[in-house]
From Swiss-Prot:
Gene: tsaC
Transmembrane segments: none
Top EC category: transferase
EC numbers: 2.7.7.87
Key words, A-Z: ATP-binding, Cytoplasm, Nucleotide-binding, Nucleotidyltransferase, Transferase, tRNA processing
Name assigned to this protein: Threonylcarbamoyl-AMP synthase
């Protein structure tokens, strides 16, 4: 990861200044920002032409970065989640009062993934917190896997692109309910 140190540091600086970045994930390029910065999230919603009602997925480098945003769940259910992490699996949890409404949208849950992607994980570690992870696309368009297309579509609309290899998955991550195990998106 030494080859990416400066790029990650630049991305973290951008995030701390309220910027919106693109970065590689397990499947596609993601667009993200500081989930606690309302202005940054509003900018991301504008860029994606996305309704605030939909909510966002958060990625983290470890559970403790996102645990305060969730209500406690049954230990067996939590163990099932932990069996898939770190990895390309997103789970919804009951949202705590700490979870901003602009992240949960119209839902009483919050969607979380502890990422296994080396750059995304390092980005969360260096940022010292979770990030929004939304597929790099505009509403209704397919997610972007190629940095050249990313630049064409988003150009100067985003503040920083952290280039790097994508993970081996070719579709956005599945989403499951952490309490029931129900598949919400394949």
């Amino acid at each position: 990861m030494d080859d990416y140190t400066q790029s990650i540091n630049d991305a973290v600086k951008c995030l701390r200044q309220g910027g919106v970045i693109a970065y590689p994930t397990e499947a596609v390029y993601g667009l993200g920002c500081d989930p606690f910065n309302h202005d940054a999230v509003a900018q991301l919603l504008t860029i994606k032409k996305r309704s605030i009602k939909k909510g966002f997925i958060l990625i983290a480098s470890e559970w403790k970065q996102v645990e305060p945003l969730t209500e406690p769940i049954d230990p067996k259910a939590l163990a099932r989640v932990f069996d898939t992490w770190p990895g390309p699996f997103t789970w919804t949890f009951p949202a705590s009062k700490e979870a901003p409404h602009w992240i949960t949208g119209q839902h009483s849950t919050i969607a979380i993934r502890v990422t296994a992607h080396p750059l995304a994980k390092l980005l969360c570690q260096r940022f010292a917190g979770p990030l929004i992870s939304s597929s790099a696309n505009q509403e209704g368009e397919p997610p972007i896997r190629d940095v050249k297309i990313l630049r064409l579509v988003f150009g100067n609309k985003i503040d920083k692109i952290l280039e790097g290899p994508l993970g081996p998955t070719h579709r956005p991550t599945p989403i499951r309910d952490a309490i029931t195990g129900e598949i919400l998106r394949l």
